[in-house]
């Protein structure tokens, strides 16, 4: 942990990437369920559209690795090729890359340090093209900012925020 400068999680930005808060006002449930890169259930797809999923993942990473919020962040990566990165104190960055298929990072998390066969296709680096990144617009995606605020508060704030999100998505 003392060798880690920061942990960087990535997200695609969902179907609403690049929109302002005003543009998001009229979006429907059907709009939220049109994820550009992943096929998932409706609850997680809505969480991806609001970036609440990334806020929850930041909290999870903090707790899993014992890192403060200042060392865990998230950025937008539309191609969904890079799933996460670790920046070390010497400036080196290690990234977990793969095709946009969650079986790869989930399998890695569940079997590490072992390496088991995964049916997901291999990543063709030459076919990837450019890999682009953007900052998360917390004004347009206040759920991400809310999750970070809950992480700062600590205690039961994260659980309360998660419960409120569950109820809100169920009503959406």
Regions found by a protein language model. Give the residues of each.
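Catalytic, metal-anchored helix/loop core of enzyme active sites in primary metabolism
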Residues: 1-172
